[in-house]
Amino acid sequence: MAASSSLDHLSNRMKLEWHSKLNTEMVPAKNFRRTSIICTIGPKTNSVEKINALRRAGLNVVRMNFSHGSYEYHQSVIDHAREAEKQQAGRPVAIALDTKGPEIRTGNTVGDKDIPIKAGHEMNISTDEQYATASDDQNMYVDYKNITKVISAGKLIYVDDGILSFEVLEVVDDKTLRVRCLNNGNISSRKGVNLPGTDVDLPALSEKDISDLKFGVKNKVDMVFASFIRRGSDIRHIREVLGEEGREIQIIAKIENQQGVNNFDEILEETDGVMVARGDLGIEIPAPKVFIAQKMMIAKCNIKGKPVICATQMLESMTYNPRPTRAEVSDVANAVLDGADCVMLSGETAKGNYPCEAVTMMSETCLLAEVAIPHFNVFDELRNLAPRPTDTVESIAMAAVSASLELNAGAIVVLTTSGNTARMISKYRPVCPIIMVSRNPAATRYSHLYRGVWPFYFPEKKPDFNVKIWQEDVDRRLKWGINHGLKLGIINKGDNIVCVQGWRGGMGHTNTVRVVPAEENLGLSE
């Protein structure tokens, strides 16, 4: 116990010492941002020119929100993103499909008119179809048939993101709840319904979601942001729908309710990554507790080595204003300090008046926040928390990051097929960039999910291997990755470069770490 306390004290002292040396005149390297930026593409940004402008500002991942828009519209986003990628060859752009998810909604009001009600007003919430198009101030329809089975007296019901709140007084029968309104507001048509603190049995996917996922598979999207994930089995169901053709699509579980928070460990086991979706989560649980949930989920993802995205209202005021609030900038920086791999913009880039300015502001904020991270402390903590015995890939990842820190290396160059080795190196948060070289174009795109990874697609065909040709191919790829780093200015000539590779051709062989100088050739002729 005493030893543990001593270590904790040393760690805290080092962290405080690191922070005490920060100053506002620091200028981070603008050409190396570790945190990826996800941008929602909407009417204001759906063109090749706009997407290229967002890329120059810092975009890494294009997000399509399937709560809105037709297939024709989303197809145009995909086509524009792919064309933009071609115009900056070698720098992949990932495409994400964000599902609408299963939801509960009210019915239509009489005449589709808003119906005012006051705090204290008592009425019924009903699943009876006779009110589906005739809701009024006495009977409001909701389309969740099992609501009377899962909810109980004393529970809350929020309508329209909590603008209208009800307390359940009584479960009258299998179709009817007696409720009391808690605030003044309007009953309106087709508004979303939340049941905070109530476990619901909605399916993981609606029929629309299934159709949308098939559209995504057909168009070879790189990742799915799966809305309203409540349990680990939801992820398994999504994998079944994606099928063999969609096996490389990364599934990112959006945690948006108390059930998802309660079942987070089992979800984390199944998913490829997590999104802390703070909008709906802040409705389902008390807003001050979202801060705790964010810290917990990001920490568990970091320990597990799975990517985590922080999202919702990060620079919301920049939708209509050229500058963010100080609180918003602090929110972005805090997410980076917490350990988020990616941060996301929604309305700011989808419909905002200042999309490029928002991305630039987010990029600059991430760069400065990354300077404040005590990387040696983070590495030691993650290494101490790694389960023992570790597997080969994780051991090599730890060794590579340790070497990079001790050598003050300019970069870690990793050769990979699936991107898994790059993910594990990213887990241990090196200071230097991770230059990933892969012949797998899908892996180069979805590796934008991993903090610090700069993915490059290696276009040369894989040769028929013997030992000599294999080693030449390895050196060629390493040289190719180093040269790209030199051209982009993320490494400098003469830097020590930590290289991670297989020790021989084929799958399943132990990886090797070696150190080479950053030169234009590694003993190979051009």
Swiss-Prot record:
Q: Which CDD domains does UniProt cross-reference here?
A: Pyruvate_Kinase
Q: Which domain of life is it from?
A: Eukaryota
UniProt-annotated binding residues for ATP: 65-68, 105, 191
Pathway annotation: Carbohydrate degradation; glycolysis; pyruvate from D-glyceraldehyde 3-phosphate: step 5/5
Q: How is its activity regulated?
A: Regulated by phosphoenolpyruvate substrate and allosteric effectors such as fructose 1,6 diphosphate and magnesium.
Which residues carry the site feature described as Transition state stabilizer? 254
Its protein name is Pyruvate kinase
MF-aspect GO terms: ATP binding; kinase activity; magnesium ion binding; potassium ion binding; pyruvate kinase activity
What InterPro entries does UniProt report for this protein, alphabetically?
Pyr_Knase, Pyrv/PenolPyrv_kinase-like_dom, Pyrv_kinase-like_dom_sf, Pyrv_Knase-like_insert_dom_sf, Pyrv_Knase_AS, Pyrv_Knase_brl, Pyrv_Knase_C, Pyrv_Knase_C_sf
Regarding protein family, the annotation reads: Belongs to the pyruvate kinase family.
